[in-house]
From Swiss-Prot:
Keywords: Amino-acid biosynthesis, Cytoplasm, Histidine biosynthesis, Lyase. Gene3D superfamilies: Aldolase class I. This is Imidazole glycerol phosphate synthase subunit HisF. IGPS catalyzes the conversion of PRFAR and glutamine to IGP, AICAR and glutamate. The HisF subunit catalyzes the cyclization activity that produces IGP and AICAR from PRFAR using the ammonia provided by the HisH subunit. The lineage of its organism: Bacteria, Bacillati, Actinomycetota, Actinomycetes, Bifidobacteriales. The keyword Hydrolase does not apply.
Amino acid sequence: MSLAVRVIPCLDVDDGRVVKGVHFENLRDAGDPVELAAEYYRQGADELTFLDVTASSSHRQTMVNVVTRTAEQIFIPLTVGGGVRTPEDVDSLLRCGADKVSVNTAAINDPTLISRVAERFGNQVLVLSVDARRERGEQHTQSGFEVTTMGGRKSTGIDALWWARRAEELGAGEVLLNSMDADGTQQGFDLEMIRAMREVVSIPIIASGGAGKAQDFPPAIAAGADAVLAASIFHYGKVTIGEVKDELRRAGYAVR
């Protein structure tokens, strides 16, 4: 595990606006991703992730503008994902201030995207986003964890553990592991999935999906994650980044 545990808020951005509800009384505009990013920076976030949920070419410039404005105000690593299909997309996001780029569906459709991006920009730039769920009924994968797309609505039949290991071989620098079963439940991370992923990859794992309280975070690290990512519990002010870090410290983990 890396030395300090990273705590990462995630912002879903649709046509330049944050779409999951955000409740901060001190923000003039809780839907503005730049203002919200600055708030999380003040709270002590280690990194930030923007997910462009529209991700159509017509909205690409909007996201570029958001990243540019954010990078001028915050000085922690910024990851941008959603609709990244080519090395040129990666180049444009890095040029406007992103530090890392996450890929998902496009890499499933063309795994060479991973190696092409890694060779051109370095594997530290590339985050593989895996939306995984437990198979129900008849099992088609060896591990029982299947890769999904379309926000968990579409099955791929691809084993999530196999895919992450393959992506690491191709040059991915990190895995963002999002449990589609736990996502939005606020019942805690899928620890079994994290443990299973830790056994097959050596690159850092960012655990996502299921955080509901500060006490949910240390078990994810104990299971093998190097970083923890959450959205709604931070947006609604249910838990602060400081409270998560305090809980991690109490559990004996180093935080920045």
